[in-house]
Structure formats: C-alpha cells, structure tokens
Amino acid sequence: AYSWDNRVKYVVRYMYDIDNNGFLDKNDFECLALRNTLIEGRGEFNEAAYANNQKIMSNLWNEIAELADFNKDGEVTIDEFKKAVQNVCVGKAFATFPAAFKVFIANQFKTVDVNGDGLVGVDEYRLDCISRSAFANIKEIDDAYNKLATDADKKAGGISLARYQELYAQFISNPDESANAVYLFGPLKEVQ
C-alpha cells in the first residue's frame, strides 16, 4: 500500500478526483475551490476566500493539464498524472516543485489545520484520515501519526507548514516505502 505507484494513485483518487469519475478534469478543481473554502471557513462561506480558492484551483488545473494531459483531451488519467509526477517531482525537493503544486500543498495544509494554529496535531490528523478512508480502530491512525511525526514535531505540538510541505514532497517524490512521509495521509489501503 505504500509503494510510490499506490501513493500517486491515492493522491489522484482521494485528493484531486473529488467527483470520483476516475480521472482529473476542470470540474474537480472547481469543486475543490468550494470544498476548500467551506473547510477553511469551518462551514461559513466567504466570497473573497472562494474567489481566491477559485483562482488557485484554476491555476492548479491549468498547470496539471499542461504537465499531464498528454493527449490534450481535457482529462488527466491516473497514468498520465503518474508520468507527469515522475517527470516533474520524483527525486526533487518541495522548493523545486511547480508553483501551482506548492500553492495546492499549502492550501491542503490549511484544510487539515482546522484550528488554525499553524500545526497539524494528532486530533487534526485523525479527522483528516477519516475524511477519506474507513477505520474501525483509532490505534491504526495513531500508529501512523507516530510513524510520521518526529520527536521534534511532537514536542512542537504537531507538524508545521514547512514540515508538511517537506513531507508532501517526499510522499509523491520519494520511491522509498520506508520513509516516514508515506504516512502523511494516514494508513493507506491499496488503490484499485
């Protein structure tokens, strides 16, 4: 479940393919703009935040389409996305990622940091995990957090934005299945 191939499939399926049709298209990113606005506002709708999220997600879609829509049909398949990630991200640090990817990762952090304190603690990590997958035992989630977070993270009270960016970059760019970053989105299941 922690292979690079499965992790990239996981990102497509659970992070971007919000309409669950099996590929990425402009609609996914329009829906993500609204979703992120509501999560960031804890259910409150803010027009300015929505306009900002629409711009961010439109830019992200345009960049993903440019990098990954190899046949220019307006859809990015999992295989196309994997090829693009391999070309642009594998073996690279967060600082060298395309600008839209960096903005998306920072925004993703904001949706996980529900209390807005600048850290993702175990409580927020648990909420993030259960929003995408089914778990019957909290120990499974907590064990994953303990494998993800370093002693310094735990001492600070959670994972900072800079650390989250580093972990996200490793999640999609590092083929090493033993890296602690493989637990960024919780215990993973095999993506079909």
UniProtKB/Swiss-Prot annotation:
A GO MF term: calcium ion binding
Q: Which residues bind Ca(2+) 1?
A: D17, D19, N21, D28
Identify the residues that bind Ca(2+) 3. D113, N115, D117, E124
Keywords tagged on the record: Acetylation, Calcium, Metal-binding, Muscle protein, Repeat
**InterPro entries attached to this UniProt entry:** EF-hand-dom_pair (IPR011992), EF_Hand_1_Ca_BS (IPR018247), EF_hand_dom (IPR002048)
Any one Pfam family match given in the protein's UniProt record, by short name: EF-hand_5
Q: Which domain of life is it from?
A: Eukaryota
Ligand binding (Ca(2+) 2):
D69, N71, D73, E75, E80
Q: Which PROSITE patterns match?
A: EF_HAND_1, EF_HAND_2
Q: What is known about what this protein does?
A: Like parvalbumins, SCPs seem to be more abundant in fast contracting muscles, but no functional relationship can be established from this distribution.
Q: What is this protein called?
A: Sarcoplasmic calcium-binding protein 1
Organism this protein belongs to? Astacus leptodactylus (Turkish narrow-clawed crayfish)
